[in-house]
């Protein structure tokens, strides 16, 4: 049964009440103060002070100062008036209980409102941070597009200049060919003139030497061969057969069926898209791409904005729930936020999608085992965590970090801490 304190003193003005309460040697750490607009309680075991105030006060602006084994309260009145007494008189036990319960309810409602206001402010901060990040991403994307456009314009100009140079060079070659052809024609004409002149002189000489009455014949006949242009080449075609993509695995260790199944699952995952989402109408075209959302989540994770990264991965998973890297990256975010059960669920889902086990997905499977094992260990489920770490070591036996962590878990299970 606490001892009621009655040796207090108080003074007042029209706007405030000043109450001095001795602590009677009780440590300040053991003192509990509860104040509402109509009720004041100070509990410092084994003593208790209660005051059912004469009129309402402004408990938010009121203050309490502790020092020299005394608590001094400054209580500001809601209405400027002089009080007859500090506590209201003529109050029975039932009335006191109702005032206590009402004060507790008021304090609970105020605490609830403060919690909701804090949560709303946190959501607004997250929304603002996400909008700022998206704005930065948009500016970077626009900058990259402008750079691409400038490079495209430069390349187009260079290509046009090269085409113009080729056209002029072709025209120059054509002119040179025509000039050579004209020179050849002139040479042929000159050769013909020379041949005609020689044949004429020979005919005249033969006529002069031949007997009378005998017909003379021109025994000189000349055939000129003109240069002929070769015919154009015939059209042909070359058939190219591309080799199929194969994994760099020795034939004796090959898992052809599993590797083909993994490639098939990857292709199916890239084609699987869920567009029946109401929020899609408010998104831009690139924001509807799971790969773009995954990259955005990775950048947000790098800036330690884990909640925004989870939001990006959530939307990407709603668009395409067959991509294991989305679950794997979201598990890393949940680990950072200590959402351990969710981290275990996402790691397990990633391992389910990373089947069948092949060399191409070995690194992702190793990370999934490590993240799930880390979550188990933080939940103090060390045996399950060690099983995941051993599975990771089977995939990558040369990973020194995983080896050290697995050894630490074994020591915890055996009851001995590994000396660092």
Curated annotation (Swiss-Prot):
One of the record's GO molecular function terms: nuclear estrogen receptor binding
Cellular compartments per GO CC: cytoplasm; cytosol; dynein axonemal particle; extracellular region; neuron projection; nucleus; plasma membrane
GO biological process per UniProt: cilium movement; determination of left/right symmetry; epithelial cilium movement involved in extracellular fluid movement; establishment of localization in cell; heart development; inner dynein arm assembly; learning or memory; neuron migration
UniProt-annotated stretches for the region Mediates interaction with ESR1 and STUB1: 7-103
InterPro entries per UniProt: CS_dom, CS_DYX1C1, Dynein_assembly_factor_4, HSP20-like_chaperone, TPR-like_helical_dom_sf, TPR_rpt
Stretches assigned to the CS domain: 3-87
KW Ligase (keyword) present: no
PROSITE patterns the record matches: CS, TPR, TPR_REGION
Compartments, record wording: Nucleus; Cytoplasm; Dynein axonemal particle; Cell projection, Neuron projection
Record-annotated membrane-spanning stretches: none
UniProt keyword annotation of Nuclease present: no
Pfam families for this protein: CS (PF04969)
Entry's disease: Dyslexia 1: A relatively common, complex cognitive disorder characterized by an impairment of reading performance despite adequate motivational, educational and intellectual opportunities. It is a multifactorial trait, with evidence for familial clustering and heritability.
Function of the protein: Axonemal dynein assembly factor required for ciliary motility. Involved in neuronal migration during development of the cerebral neocortex. May regulate the stability and proteasomal degradation of the estrogen receptors that play an important role in neuronal differentiation, survival and plasticity.
Assembly, per entry: Interacts with ZMYND10. Interacts with ESR1 and ESR2. Interacts with STUB1. Interacts with DNAAF2. Interacts with CCT3, CCT4, CCT5 and CCT8. Interacts with DNAAF6/PIH1D3.
Record protein name field: Dynein axonemal assembly factor 4
Protein's organism: Homo sapiens (Human)
Lineage: Eukaryota, Metazoa, Chordata, Craniata, Vertebrata
